[in-house]
Amino acid sequence: MTVLHSIDFFSSSSAPVAIEARAPQSAFPEHHHDFYEIVIVEEGAGVHVFNGNPYTLSRGCVCFVRDHDRHLFESTDDLFLTNVLFRAPDAFRFLSGVGHFLPRECDGVYPSHWRVNGQVLQQIKCLIACLEHAPKSDQVEDIALHESVFMQLLVKLWQGCQTQVGDDQEGRLYQLLDWLQNNYSEAVEWPELADRFALPLRTLHRQLKNKTGMTPQRYLTRLHLLQARHQLCYSDNSVTDIAYLCGFGDSNHFSTLFKREFSQSPRDLRSQL
């Protein structure tokens, strides 16, 4: 597995933060690094496999990667990212309490993926632009100013995650996307789901395609297939059981779709493990 080292990304040993833009981000194999990373999705779509679990990416996704996590990007489609790198939550000279504004693992569950709305993405652009420039010097006041901008960015993201579940259409669409991610095995009737999240059906179709680059049904099928691949790799369930657990009513149809998506059959994937 590829290991990325901080010495290759930070401008100096005293630099607390580094910015790496990916415009666009191409597919990248599984890797980990000796620093922390905040991945902010500005445009496009793709799949982020984080510690073996697949997450679909779209504009407004924010991913928090620790120094012991492993991840990869695949199926990227004009995926524009800004990566904010920092050494560790407790590695700043003048900041304390950074961990309060980061995801916290609870009972083995780490909420690594957040969402923020378009307004927050606009608000943080100037902060990211400031962080792109290394501190003017190694003087304590320049390091302190640089760290303070990072804290502003972190607080903006945290506030944005707390408020994105608002009652406007964008907030309700984000709630719907999160529901689909967490309930991939349930049967979906789009008119009922539109009513559940108080979205006109045509608006749901249009906005979901704008956010993900896919029709709702294509997006749902992709979610099912990604979860099925995860089950094939990390469970002992049979191919037939996995097909039903992941929302497919017919195992043969599942195998056909799986091969079309990943260029190999479910059984071929299993045989390679």
UniProtKB/Swiss-Prot annotation:
PANTHER family: HTH-TYPE TRANSCRIPTIONAL ACTIVATOR RHAS, HTH-TYPE TRANSCRIPTIONAL ACTIVATOR RHAS-RELATED. GO terms for cellular component: cytoplasm. This is HTH-type transcriptional activator RhaS. SMART domains: HTH_ARAC. It is found in: Cytoplasm. The gene is rhaS. It holds the Pfam family AraC_binding. GO terms for molecular function: cis-regulatory region sequence-specific DNA binding; DNA-binding transcription factor activity. PROSITE patterns: HTH_ARAC_FAMILY_2. Transmembrane segments: none annotated. Activates expression of the rhaBAD and rhaT operons.
